[in-house]
């Protein structure tokens, strides 16, 4: 059995919980999906999903709770969406706490402010996916070994590095479980 933790410090936690639970059920795998609020809870999961929200607040709370240290020390696979993408970076256009798990530079709010939010069909992993972009970041540059999975309007919106996945958009707000399934399959390969 694997345990997937949804970081529950701030952001759209319930949407990720529901989507991840639905995904493991559809996949027919033995998995538990739980909220992670403390370093102790972070130590009990095989992977963590960091949702959208306010990246500065989430980063600060991850430091205060010790969750950041657990993720880094125990090399937990992480999927970060929107604010989670920002937190996975090792550099951003704003001074804030970061995990630094992916060699990339991210620009916060690259697609504009809240009123500029939009939805678009994107190509990712050889298929179409409905992307929901809310004050979305974008990757400005990636280091060696970082795989670019998708671009939109010449901006990088999805990358993978090892067992870590960063998405500029919100797959948890749609109906398609494809990207959650992709991440869970990666986790299964990483924890074997």
Curated annotation (Swiss-Prot):
One of its GO terms (molecular function) is pyridoxal 5'-phosphate synthase (glutamine hydrolysing) activity. InterPro entries: Class_I_gatase-like (IPR029062), PdxT/SNO (IPR002161). Pathway: Cofactor biosynthesis; pyridoxal 5'-phosphate biosynthesis. CDD domains: GATase1_PB. GO terms for biological process: glutamine catabolic process; pyridoxal phosphate biosynthetic process; pyridoxine metabolic process. It holds the Pfam family SNO. L-glutamine binds at residues 53-55, 108, 134-135. Its EC number is 4.3.3.6, 3.5.1.2. It catalyses: aldehydo-D-ribose 5-phosphate + D-glyceraldehyde 3-phosphate + L-glutamine = pyridoxal 5'-phosphate + L-glutamate + phosphate + 3 H2O + H(+); L-glutamine + H2O = L-glutamate + NH4(+). SUPFAM superfamilies: Class I glutamine amidotransferase-like. The active site is at 82 (nucleophile), 170 (charge relay system), 172 (charge relay system). Transmembrane segments: none annotated. GO terms for cellular component: cytosol; glutaminase complex. The keyword Disulfide bond does not apply. Keywords: Glutamine amidotransferase, Hydrolase, Lyase, Pyridoxal phosphate. It comes from the Archaea. Catalyzes the hydrolysis of glutamine to glutamate and ammonia as part of the biosynthesis of pyridoxal 5'-phosphate. The resulting ammonia molecule is channeled to the active site of PdxS. Belongs to the glutaminase PdxT/SNO family. PANTHER family: PYRIDOXAL 5'-PHOSPHATE SYNTHASE SUBUNIT SNO, PYRIDOXAL 5'-PHOSPHATE SYNTHASE SUBUNIT SNO1-RELATED. In the presence of PdxS, forms a dodecamer of heterodimers. Only shows activity in the heterodimer. This is Pyridoxal 5'-phosphate synthase subunit PdxT. It comes from Methanothermobacter thermautotrophicus (strain ATCC 29096 / DSM 1053 / JCM 10044 / NBRC 100330 / Delta H).
């Amino acid at each position: 059995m694997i345990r997937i933790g949804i970081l529950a410090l701030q952001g759209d936690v319930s949407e990720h919980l529901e989507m991840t639970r639905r995904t493991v059920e559809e996949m027919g795998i033995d998995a538990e999906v739980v909220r992670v609020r403390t370093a102790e809870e972070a130590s009990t999961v095989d992977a963590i999903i960091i949702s959208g929200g306010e990246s500065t607040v989430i980063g600060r709370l991850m430091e205060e709770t010790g969750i950041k240290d657990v993720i880094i020390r125990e090399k937990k696979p992480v999927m970060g969406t929107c604010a989670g993408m920002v937190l996975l970076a090792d550099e951003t256009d704003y001074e804030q706490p970061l995990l630094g798990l992916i060699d990339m530079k991210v620009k916060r709010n690259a697609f504009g402010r809240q009123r500029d939010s939009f939805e678009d069909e994107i190509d990712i992993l050889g298929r179409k996916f409905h992307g929901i972009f809310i004050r979305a970041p974008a990757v400005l540059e990636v280091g060696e070994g970082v795989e670019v999975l998708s671009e939109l309007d010449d901006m990088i919106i999805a990358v993978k590095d090892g067992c870590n996945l960063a998405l500029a958009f919100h797959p948890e707000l749609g109906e398609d479980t494809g990207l959650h399934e992709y991440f869970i399959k990666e986790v299964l390969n990483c924890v074997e």
